[in-house]
């Protein structure tokens, strides 16, 4: 949750003069998104989300994110759509930060996704990959295989504070992944952070996918691996193969996996588990003062990694081969 | 800002079955209120605020707060109005906490109130006092003169960590206030926390007064003293007598102050300054882990107290005598 920057009523009124949204009717800082400050903004024309981009988001990537949302929305995907300024731009400045207004999506995220929800998620992910296939923009994954050792190095000496033996576990896993990472898989735009709190449901249908600020070009099947870890484990930590099978099955019905992709899932899932374990570990040691953020427990993802290390065959994760 | 308790989609759906509000369309935790968890709740019938009452609010006082809001709304005051359950009650339970739904008020709070805003605030406060005059409920002020020494005692030994000499300043002020606190002033329901972030404006008019969870029976003029401190000092710390005069003038045009009330304002303002300085100091030393709260700087209110200690006559604060 996050509101890092306060917005004054005077600054907001001045900012809105760049838009055709009428005057402000309400503004509430919301507990959504970890990297940016987000507000529900109500104006004379409707309800929107106002985002102020904080330092952790590279400003150079903002046009990529915003034009990706435009592209996906134009293809009928339920994602936030950037609202144009009178100047036709989508990116302004407010309270000293880059800022944008996007449409508000109805829906509530699922705290405990069901097997059917995992199927819906799989289909939505395939739709996202297909809708983005002809998107011209490009952004490298700043949190890929090459980045993980660099994330780990500055905190390696403290990792065992969180759990004895953690530093050795991470070093060994990094070596395994460097040696075994799959090459030449189909690439494209991935969401890269499609956790349950970024998927909105209305009744039994997915009404929206949000928070594209990790989107990048990478292996499409790596996005599935991220979702496998985020959606298909039970709260107690057990993997649920029915959820995996539902997700992979629904995805593959729209975008079939190649044999190489299917085979690579266990390794990709180990990488995805390590990636979130590492960034959570970094956050754990680096909660900025006054950030109003509860760092997520990194051990959840180390436990998932430990389970994934026991998997010999993608079918054990629900992949249909 | 605060969201202490997460609400699952399943628990929320079950909770809404007690209401005639239709199904949920969106739920966003918001950065509003320090004591409770607040959400903007959108349903098929409209937009509301959902509040989960956390431990710091005495559960026994919740019926008082909710019936006060009913009373004020019935008299035309723009305040949140509790939404009735099918059972006619206004107080339910959600995620293990007492919980209520109230109407959503449009408007944006003023970060830097103008002189005219201070006049509007004065009039709104008088309207609140008058509208509450025939309210039957009663609640003692848990943070009154008698409570301040008890707030201070457990943190007295640490006060000088915040500023050298602070403990002695507080002790001397407590003695002064015990000896000089005005008696027999007109009493009634006071808001007791009417800071700028609890007053919503649409354009140049006040569109709503919110957050009644400190409301109680006390000296009506003490409510004015709280507002004087919260509204009539500039960001740099200087007192603005024009703002004081605007506030007192607009208030008195609806509810004239007695001579005793007018004369008491400087002492009441010292008490009000000490009350907020003390609770901020307590919070400063007691930020609960994971509370997602930025404690407010207690020194702001000690600086106001210091200025108020130099005031010999209520007219120096803008009171018309």
Curated annotation (Swiss-Prot), chains A, B:
Domain of life of the organism encoding this protein: Bacteria
UniProt pathway: Amino-acid biosynthesis; L-threonine biosynthesis; L-threonine from L-aspartate: step 4/5
GO MF terms, alphabetically ordered: ATP binding; homoserine kinase activity
Key words, A-Z: Amino-acid biosynthesis, ATP-binding, Kinase, Nucleotide-binding, Threonine biosynthesis, Transferase
Pfam family, one: APH
EC numbers, comma separated: 2.7.1.39
InterPro entries in the record: Aminoglycoside_PTrfase, Homoserine_kinase_II, Kinase-like_dom_sf, Pseudomonas-type_ThrB
GO annotation, biological process: threonine biosynthetic process
Residues in coiled coil: none
Chemical reaction(s) catalysed: L-homoserine + ATP = O-phospho-L-homoserine + ADP + H(+)
Root EC class: transferase
Family: Belongs to the pseudomonas-type ThrB family.
Name of this protein: Homoserine kinase
């Amino acid at each position: 949750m996050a509101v890092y920057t306060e917005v004054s009523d005077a600054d907001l009124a001045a900012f809105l003069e760049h838009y055709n949204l009428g005057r402000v009717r309400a503004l509430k800082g919301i507990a959504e998104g970890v990297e940016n400050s987000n507000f529900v903004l109500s104006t004379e024309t409707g309800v929107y989300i106002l985002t102020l981009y904080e330092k952790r988001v590279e400003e150079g990537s903002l046009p990529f994110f915003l034009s990706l949302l435009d592209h996906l929305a134009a293809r009928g995907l339920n994602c936030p759509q950037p609202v144009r300024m009178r100047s036709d731009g989508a990116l302004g400045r407010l309270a000293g930060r880059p800022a944008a207004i996007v449409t508000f999506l109805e829906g509530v995220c699922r705290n405990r996704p069901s097997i059917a929800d995992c199927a819906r998620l799989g289909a939505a992910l395939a739709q996202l990959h297909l809708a983005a296939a002809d998107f011209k923009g490009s952004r490298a994954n700043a949190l890929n295989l090459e980045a993980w050792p660099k994330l780990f190095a500055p905190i390696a000496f403290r990792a065992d504070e969180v759990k004895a033996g953690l530093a050795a576990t991470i070093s060994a896993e990094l070596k395994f992944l460097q040696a075994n990472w799959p090459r030449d898989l189909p690439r494209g735009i991935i969401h890269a952070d499609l956790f349950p709190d970024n998927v909105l449901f209305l009744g039994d249908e997915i009404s929206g996918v949000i928070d594209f600020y990790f989107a990048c070009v990478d292996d499409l099947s790596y996005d599935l691996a991220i979702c496998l870890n985020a959606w298909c484990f039970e709260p107690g930590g057990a993997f649920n193969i029915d959820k995996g099978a539902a997700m992979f099955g629904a995805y593959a019905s729209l975008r079939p996996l190649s044999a190489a992709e299917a085979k690579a899932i266990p390794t990709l899932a180990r990488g995805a588990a390590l990636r979130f374990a590492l960034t959570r570990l970094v956050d754990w040691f680096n909660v900025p003062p006054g950030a109003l953020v509860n760092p997520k427990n990194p051990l959840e993802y180390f436990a998932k990694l430990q389970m994934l290390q026991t998997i010999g065959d993608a079918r054990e994760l629900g992949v249909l081969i």
